[in-house]
Design a protein with these regions (language model features):
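Conserved hydrophobic beta-strand positions in leucine-rich repeat
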Residues: 15-20, 37-42, 59-63, 80-84, ...
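Generic hydrophobic, aliphatic-rich segments that mediate packing or membrane embedding
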Residues: 14-16, 21-27, 33-36, 43-46, ...
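The feature encodes a structural signal of leucine-rich repeats
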Residues: 3-9, 25-31, 47-53, 68-74, ...
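Consensus "Asn ladder" position of solenoid repeat domains
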Residues: 1, 23, 45, 66, ...
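Leucine-rich repeat
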Residues: 11-14, 31-37, 54-58, 74-79, ...
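Contiguous hydrophobic segments
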Residues: 59-67, 72, 80-81, 85, ...
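Leucine-rich repeat domain C-terminal region
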Residues: 73, 91-94, 113, 134, ...
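LRR N-terminal entry segment and analogous cap-like coil->beta motifs
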Residues: 1-26, 38, 79, 120
Length: 248
């Protein structure tokens, strides 16, 4: 509707669900009086900041496809699901550690160069595809993370994963720059990893690629789009044992 002014909403203090997508909003301050708000969608506006006055019951926000450049000023204590997809965010530093309830964070299609700043111990799903991430930093705080999407980034090394990420089950690294299996071996620190996507990395063109990954990561249940077959697993175990004996 090409709205630029939502000051009228200040009167409707009991609103729970508000969708203001596809307008021309630059200012959300009138929403600060909506203290009962549970759900807010403001996709496709002209917002340059996600900063808002703290709303005590707000659980879901989508700021997708705006012009937001940082993650400061998001402090809603019950926020569980936050989408900032398709903005211009360059760093997660400034993300409030007071987001105690945040489970899902969507940041696809931004300009992140690092994973530093995601100090969110309750986070379960983190979507970072289509950024410019070159380095993995600060992941040790993500102890409850189960899903991590890093597709279409610029990773050449896999330093940064650590054993404190004891719940991570699904990792998507498709279309990065992982060129050798020594980097894949660094994923051995992830005790619960079950599904891994490595398609469109240089290492996926190596001969016996699937076998080499399974030798390094014997607990995988799915590699790329296919489940790990029993005979594949047996062959990988056999080669691993032979190599271990040769090293002795």
């Amino acid at each position: 509707r090409d709205l630029t002014d939502i000051s009228l909403l200040e009167c409707f203090i009991h609103l729970r669900y508000v969708d203001l997508s596809e307008n021309k909003l630059q200012d959300l301050s009138p929403l600060s009086s909506l203290t009962h708000l549970l759900w807010l969608k403001v996709d496709g506006n002209l917002l340059t900041s996600a900063r808002m006055q703290e709303l005590p019951y707000l659980q879901i926000i989508s700021f997708a496809h705006n012009h937001i450049k940082d993650m400061e000023g998001i402090t809603h204590p019950r926020l569980a699901n936050l989408s900032l997809k398709g903005n211009k965010i360059q760093t997660a530093l400034g993300l409030s550690q007071a987001l105690f309830s945040l489970h899902d964070l969507e940041l696809r299609g931004n300009k992140l160069e690092s994973t530093a700043g995601f100090n969110l111990p309750k986070l379960k799903n983190l979507y970072l595809a289509q950024n410019a991430i070159r380095s993995l930093e600060g992941l040790e705080a993500l102890e409850q993370l189960t899903t991590l999407h890093l597709r279409d980034n610029q990773l050449e090394t896999l330093d940064g994963f650590c054993s404190s990420m004891k719940c991570l089950q699904y990792l998507n690294l498709r279309n990065n720059g992982i060129s050798n299996f020594q980097e894949v071996a660094k994923l051995q620190v992830l005790p619960m990893l079950q599904a891994l996507v490595l398609l469109d990395n240089p290492c996926s063109d190596e001969p016996n690629y699937r076998l080499e990954v399974l030798i390094l990561l014997p607990h995988l249940e799915r590699l790329d789009k296919e489940s790990v077959e029993q005979d594949e697993r047996a062959e990988a175990n056999e080669i691993r044992q032979k190599r271990q004996e040769e090293e002795k």
